Amino acid sequence: MTELMRIAALFAATALAEIVGCYLPWLVLKEGRPVWLLVPAALSLALFAWLLTLHPSAAGRTYAAYGGVYIAVALVWLRVVDGVALTRWDVAGAVLALGGMAVIALQPRA
């Protein structure tokens, strides 16, 4: 597995944990779903925080690069979970964001 693939997979897992951790409370508050969903939401957000510690860069750089992957994963969620078709603007934005992530994450280390 290349370094970019490893970083992207870790970022994708991190984004998924964050999205699930935020989506479940949204279901409780917006859709009237059972309150017990807040328990797996809290666990998912704890997993999200732990996954962030596995990234090799300084926290600020990790968060900056992570943002690009989060955008792409959120758009996949929009399509798969919410059932909303992506526009070419969604795809273009995700490509730009992932390009920015790659520049930040793969910069030469001094």
UniProtKB/Swiss-Prot annotation:
Q: Which family, according to UniProt? A: Belongs to the UPF0060 family.
Transmembrane domains' residue ranges: 9-29, 34-54, 66-86, 88-108
- Which NCBIfam families does this one have? PRK02237.1 (NF002586)
Which top-level group of life is the source organism from?
Bacteria
Chief site of localization: membrane
Compartmental location? Cell inner membrane
Which of UniProt's keywords are assigned here? Cell inner membrane, Cell membrane, Membrane, Transmembrane, Transmembrane helix
Whether Transmembrane counts among this entry's keywords is yes
Membrane topology according to the record = Multi-pass membrane protein
Name of this protein:
UPF0060 membrane protein Bcep18194_A4425
Its GO CC terms are: plasma membrane
Kindly indicate whether the keyword Cell membrane belongs to this entry.
Answer: yes
